Structure formats: C-alpha cells, structure tokens
From Swiss-Prot:
Gene3D superfamilies: P-loop containing nucleotide triphosphate hydrolases (3.40.50.300), Peptide chain release factor 3, domain III (3.30.70.3280). Belongs to the TRAFAC class translation factor GTPase superfamily. Classic translation factor GTPase family. PrfC subfamily. Disulfide bonds: none annotated. The gene is prfC. One of its GO terms (molecular function) is translation release factor activity, codon nonspecific. PANTHER family: PEPTIDE CHAIN RELEASE FACTOR RF3 (PTHR43556:SF2). Coiled coil: none annotated. It is found in: Cytoplasm. One of its GO terms (biological process) is regulation of translational termination. Increases the formation of ribosomal termination complexes and stimulates activities of RF-1 and RF-2. It binds guanine nucleotides and has strong preference for UGA stop codons. It may interact directly with the ribosome. The stimulation of RF-1 and RF-2 is significantly reduced by GTP and GDP, but not by GMP. Keywords: Cytoplasm, GTP-binding, Nucleotide-binding, Protein biosynthesis. It holds the Pfam family EF-G_D2. GO terms for cellular component: cytosol. It comes from Syntrophobacter fumaroxidans (strain DSM 10017 / MPOB). This is Peptide chain release factor 3.
C-alpha cells in the first residue's frame, strides 16, 4: 500500500450521531455541515412549524412530521479531514435502523438535552455502542435554555450510562444567562453572539481568565467561571485517549447547536480525537483497513431516494482496499461478479458520482433488488462481515388494500420497503393476508404514507391480533415438519421466506416454546 493510500485512510472519520428524540440531533448535524462548509445556510429546524426543513430530513413524511425517520449519510471536509457523518433516526420507532448504522461507524457523537438529561432512547443506544466498544464523544445541547447544572448532568451520565465523563469545555451560565463556552483544552474563553443560520465569528475570545475585562462583561459569572475551571483542573478525570477509544470514557462538550455555541470547539476536538477506520470482524478473520484488496458490507438499503426514477440505493461501508470507478467485485451471497460503475457519495438526497473511495467511506450502489442488508462485497476472498442485526418486531398490523386491482403494486411496494429493513412483511401460511411487523408503531404510518406517495397504492391497516414473532428453526427435519403441521395457523413466511411463529400473546409464546424444546425460537437474526 502506497503512502497516499495510507494517508487517505488515516484522515477519514466516520461517525454516527445518536440521541433521544428532540435533543437537537438534526440541528447539530446541520451546524456540523455548516462549519464544515458543506452548506452555506442552515435550515431553521422547528419541527412541524418550519417552512424550511433540515438538510438531512429529506423524505416527505420527515418534512411533514419534523422527525428523522431514515438515516442520512453526508460527507464533508474539515481541516483536511474527510468526514462521513451518519445522521440516525432519533424517534424510538426507528431504532433498528440506528442499530444497524452503528455497525458501520468508527465512533459516535451522543447528543443530550441539558434540561432532560439522559433519556430512555439514549440508554438503549448506549447499550449497542457498549456491545461494540464504540468510542463516544458527548455534546450537551440547549444550554441557551434553562436546564440542569453541568455537574448534575455529568453525574447523571456517569450513573445511568456507566461511562466516565471528562469535560473538555465548560458553559458560562445557562438559559437567559448563558454567555458562551470555555475551551478547557485550548484554554480559551469564547463569548458568542447568537447566530442560527451562518458561521458567526463575531464573538469575543479571551486567552486569559484573569483579564479584568471579563469582570466588566460577565460580573459575578466571571468569578464563578474561574472557580469552576480551578475545580475542574484539579478534580475532573483527565482525558485518556486509550480509555476513550475503548468506550470507557467520554469527552464532554457543552453548547447550543441552534445558536452555534460550542459547535466549532466540538468539531475541532472531534477530528483530532476520533479514530480513523479500524479492523472489522468477519466469520473467518479480522480485516484491516490497510489491506490492498477491496472489501465492504451493506448496512442499509433506501428505496426511492429519487422518486422520479424509483431507484434503490444500497449503502456500503468500505472496510479495506480502495474503490475505483468500474471495478469488478464479488457479491458473495449471490455468488456472482458485478461491476460497480456509478458509485455515489451523499449529502442527504443529493448524490455525486465518484471515481475513488477509501476505507471509512460510505458509497451508494444502485440496487435492482439483488442486494440485501448484510451483503459482503470483496475483490477476491470469500468473506462475510458479521454483527449486522435484524430484530423480531413487537407490533403487528394487517394491510387493507382499498383497490384490489392494485395488488401487484402493493406487492412491489412492500417488497422494496421491506428491503430497507425498517418494516417486515409476513405472509401467513393459512391465509392470503399481508401482515406488517415493526419495532415501533410509527413505522406503520410511514409505510402507508410511502405506499401512497411512492407507489400510488391507497392502503390502510388494522390490528392483526399478534403480540410477538419468533423465527423458528430446528436441527431435526422431522421435528420441524411436525411443528409446522400442528401450528400451521400461527406460522408465516417473512420477506426472506424464513419460517416465523406469530403469537397472539406472550403467554401463548411461552407455552409453545416449552412444548417444543427442540425448536429454536429466535428473537433476533444476523442479516445474511
């Protein structure tokens, strides 16, 4: 591998942004793009009331509801670093998509609302990060609103998320008294003027906390800041890069994404601290990013990114080697060679064809129904990357088609939307229904809305009478045949034609599991 190739890998930073809904994640994403020069004007994100919408919220239903329901992938440069930012769904109903995205990143940025502290979705996502030892940087947001004290927030993060906190910036006041941020790394005090839409550089900067001008500007807050900084320098956990990289320590920054407070300090520290692409596990061995042969895996599929063309894009994380336009790769699950002629990079729905890409980069491949989540592509070696999950749904609805003549379009729409993995479709063995299964109920509204706008299918849904699903398998063909015969009315095939048991309640599921000890009831499956 030549020096330039190695340099390209080392300057890449691929990360996901995670948070509870409404913590300000999409706004922070916008501001990172703004400071990175990828956009010149940030969309004012005001949920349902906004007349404009965030760059990363591109699907019609996202604009309508003011939430992110799909993962956007955005690339930009900052201080000679190549950044791949994955803005994940914040709404809890879309957690499965977020879990998968976390398999494609090298680190994560966790956003916490200063008033609400650690919330349930944050705890769930933290669990996923912990399973993968993902390094996490924390941004405590909305300091321009009244909230908890910084020390209380740090204590709550340590208690609830079981991770050591190291503050690298410190706020001056909060709410109406919020004046700016002290950079504990650079030993600089930044006083900011609010600026929602453009990169504001008009704030004052102080290198010396003993400067008398501070007392005139801040009054009692200047004294408090000096006391806080003295306490932090003596008592706070020192930053230890190894602890951070192992996921045991989180550097913490404070600010207000909406008003650009603390965003530049966060980005400056992030590119220096966050890890470049690292080795990835496969079934047979670990793959280093510095290997010469190309390899990568698909962690997401998105239908209709361009509704005019009804296209489907497979999002592929490059793990080793280098992509070059027109290269031939092996699609291992399908057992065939394919040519990748028009790979794209993204800024939300905007796409650009590229000539080359490196480990850490996320590229889009046109998918005509043959690529699935979890698929591995390599130049030669038959590898299979591991750890991309699919979860049993917890909510179920029966599809009602209002125009029976549209059944073909319904079938096509459901097939393509289920490829994305956010909703699952089950076809009962004993009926001709389509049963939708999802991790959260909002997904049903999204599916019906997308069927209407993207496929011209007017459909609705009704309760399906199921409370749990489990994929079933057995080492004995005879046992499986007997199980199928006795439980045919409760069995269905999923989108991958895998046999699934649908239970009306948890009690019934437990009873059947106890009755059939030689059947495995799987709550999660690895994609491919």
């Amino acid at each position: 591998m030549n020096h330039r190739h190695r340099q390209e890998i080392d300057r890449r930073r691929t990360f996901g942004i995670i948070s509870h809904p409404d913590a300000g994640k999409t706004t922070l994403t916008e501001k990172l793009l703004l400071f990175g020069g990828a956009i010149q004007l940030a969309g004012a994100v005001k949920a349902r009331k906004a007349s404009r919408h965030a760059t990363s919220d591109w699907m019609a239903i996202e604009r309508e509801r003011g939430i992110s329901v799909t993962t956007s992938v955005m690339k930009f440069n900052y201080r000679d670093f190549e950044i791949n930012l994955l803005d994940t769904p914040g709404h809890q109903d879309f957690s499965e998509d977020t879990y998968r995205v976390l398999t494609a990143v090298d680190s994560a940025l966790m956003v916490i609302d200063s008033a609400k502290g650690v919330e349930p979705q944050t705890e769930k996502l933290m669990e996923v990060c912990r399973m993968r030892n993902t390094p996490i940087i924390t941004f405590i947001n909305k300091l321009d609103r009244e909230g908890q004290s910084p020390l209380a927030l740090l204590g709550e993060i340590e208690d609830k998320l079981q991770i050591e906190c190291t503050p690298l910036s410190w706020p001056i006041g909060s709410g109406k008294s919020f004046k700016g941020v002290y950079d504990l790394l650079g030993k600089k005090l930044h006083l900011f003027a609010p600026g929602q839409e453009t990169r504001t550089n008009g704030g004052m900067v102080f290198d010396d906390l003993s400067d008398a001008a501070l007392d005139e500007l801040l009054g009692r807050q200047a004294v408090q800041l000096r006391e806080d900084v003295e306490l932090l320098e003596g008592a706070a956990n020192p930053l230890e890069q190894e602890h951070y990289l192992r996921g045991n320590q989180t550097p913490v920054f404070f600010g207000s994404a909406l008003n650009n407070f603390g965003v530049r300090e966060l980005l400056d520290a992030f590119v220096q601290m966050a890890p470049p692409p690292h080795a990835r596990p496969t079934v047979s061995r670990e793959v280093s990013p510095y290997e010469d042969q190309f390899s990568g895996f698909v962690f997401k599929i998105q239908a209709n990114m361009d509704p005019a063309h009804r296209d489907r894009i497979a999002f592929l994380r490059i793990c080793s080697g280098k992509y070059t336009r027109g290269m031939k790769v092996i699609h291992h699950r399908a057992g065939r060679e394919m040519n990748i002629a028009n790979a794209t990079i993204f800024l939300a729905q905007d796409r650009t064809n590229i000539d080359e890409a490196y480990p850490g980069d996320i590229i889009g491949i046109h998918n005509h129904g043959t690529i699935k989540i979890g698929d591995t592509f390599t130049e030669k070696e038959p590898l299979r990357f591991t750890g991309i999950p699919s979860f049993a749904p917890e909510h179920f609805r029966r599809v009602i088609l209002k125009n029976p003549l549209k059944v073909k379009q319904l079938r096509k729409g459901l097939a393509q939307l289920t490829e994305e993995g956010a909703v699952q479709v089950f076809r009962p063995l004993a009926a001709r229904d389509y049963i939708l299964g999802a991790v959260g109920v909002l997904q049903f509204d999204v599916t019906v809305a997308r069927l209407r706008t993207e496929y011209g299918v007017d459909a609705d849904y009704e309760p399906a009478g199921y409370a749990a699903a489990r994929w079933v398998e057995s080492d004995s063909r005879n046992v499986m045949e007997e199980f199928e015969k006795e439980n045919r009315g409760s069995l269905a095939l999923d989108g991958e034609d895998r046999l699934t048991y649908l239970a009306p309640n948890e009690w019934r599921l437990g009873f059947v599991m106890e009755d059939w000890p030689r059947i495995r009831f799987r709550k999660s499956m690895e994609c491919n």
